């Protein structure tokens, strides 16, 4: 039998105290002020929900237990899913508000605790508006991570019209992509607005509309560190079109985009508070 010492906490759970706890509170306060100003209201969803309300009831990631009536209960695993369900199914007659934010953790198997600050604009697929709010939050913290703009529809369409499987784009197997259709190599070279405009005029017609959506998203965004990644693909539970993320090194600090859930097209993002705290503390110590 393995002896568990009194000072140990489960791997993947989070502990903040002193300087780190103060930083966490400062991040949350600044984000909430910006979100309130942008017309969002806060929602705090239950930590528990019925297992049948999860997108994938068989997922090993979901922590589950039973209540006194033997109903299967899940510990909060996806706040976006909960917000959409609760606003549309439970509070639909009580509020017409459609812009909501949350500051709370999600949990996954075995003992992972992930603190998030998220915002959802239900029934509004305005990615540019959401992106500007995300940028403002980082600027309030005097941070400018790299901003990546992508469109999940582009690799999906490329896989459909080429000999390549979607996994080639998910793993970003550059050699296979370059050895395939010429336009795929061109898409790989896109980094800035000039590249995007040049390549859009040369690609097959089935891609032009999706590339135009990327151009429209970037137009008017004043941010010094952003790149286009039109072939970026990461399997997501619901993001299937315009997608953006902000990262530094190997750490993703925020991700978001347009999604459809319960026949409602919406847009949102999630800021990963734990990653952000770690980055700021390391920078201050360095």
Curated annotation (Swiss-Prot):
Q: Which terms does the record give in the GO molecular function aspect?
A: histidine-tRNA ligase activity
Entry-linked InterPro entries: aa-tRNA-synth_II/BPL/LPL, HisRS-like_core, HisRS/HisZ
Q: Name one GO cellular component term.
A: cytoplasm
BP-aspect Gene Ontology terms: histidyl-tRNA aminoacylation; L-histidine biosynthetic process
Copy the pathway line from the protein's UniProt record.
Amino-acid biosynthesis; L-histidine biosynthesis; L-histidine from 5-phospho-alpha-D-ribose 1-diphosphate: step 1/9
Which SUPFAM superfamilies does its entry note?
Class II aaRS and biotin synthetases
Compartment annotation: Cytoplasm
UniProtKB keywords: Amino-acid biosynthesis, Cytoplasm, Histidine biosynthesis
Describe the function of this protein. Answer: Required for the first step of histidine biosynthesis. May allow the feedback regulation of ATP phosphoribosyltransferase activity by histidine.
Could you say which protein family the record assigns here? Answer: Belongs to the class-II aminoacyl-tRNA synthetase family. HisZ subfamily.
What is said about its interaction partners and assembly?
A: Heteromultimer composed of HisG and HisZ subunits.
Q: What other note does the entry give for this protein? A: This function is generally fulfilled by the C-terminal part of HisG, which is missing in some bacteria such as this one.
Q: What is this protein's name?
A: ATP phosphoribosyltransferase regulatory subunit
Task: Give the organism the record lists.
Answer: Wolinella succinogenes (strain ATCC 29543 / DSM 1740 / CCUG 13145 / JCM 31913 / LMG 7466 / NCTC 11488 / FDC 602W) (Vibrio succinogenes)
Which gene is annotated as encoding this protein in its UniProt record?
A: hisZ
């Amino acid at each position: 039998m393995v002896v568990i010492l009194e000072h140990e906490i489960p791997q993947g759970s989070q502990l903040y105290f002193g300087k780190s706890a103060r930083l966490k509170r400062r991040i949350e306060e600044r984000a909430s002020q910006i979100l309130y100003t942008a017309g969002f209201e806060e929602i705090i969803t239950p930590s528990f929900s019925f297992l049948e309300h999860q997108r994938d009831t068989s997922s090993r990631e979901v922590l589950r237990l039973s209540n006194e009536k033997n109903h299967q209960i899940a510990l909060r695993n996806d706040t976006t899913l909960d917000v959409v369900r609760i606003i549309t199914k439970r509070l639909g007659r009580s509020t017409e508000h459609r812009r909501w934010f949350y500051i709370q953790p999600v949990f996954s198997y075995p003992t992972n605790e992930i603190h998030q600050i998220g915002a959802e604009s239900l029934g509004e697929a305005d990615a540019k508006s959401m992106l500007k709010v995300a940028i403002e939050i980082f600027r309030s913290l005097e941070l400018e991570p790299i901003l990546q703009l992508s469109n999940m529809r582009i690799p999906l369409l490329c896989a459909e019209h080429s000999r390549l499987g979607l996994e080639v784009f998910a793993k970003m197997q550059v050699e296979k992509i370059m050895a395939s259709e010429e336009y795929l190599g061109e898409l790989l070279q896109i980094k800035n607005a000039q590249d995007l405009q040049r390549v859009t005029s040369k690609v097959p017609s089935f891609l032009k509309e999706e590339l135009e959506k990327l151009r429209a998203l970037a137009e008017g965004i004043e941010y010094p560190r952003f790149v286009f990644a039109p072939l970026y693909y990461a399997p997501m539970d619901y993001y299937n079109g315009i997608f953006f993320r902000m990262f530094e090194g190997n750490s993703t600090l925020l991700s978001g985009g347009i999604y459809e859930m319960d026949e409602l097209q919406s847009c949102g993002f999630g800021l990963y508070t734990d990653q952000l705290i770690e980055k700021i503390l390391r920078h201050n110590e360095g």
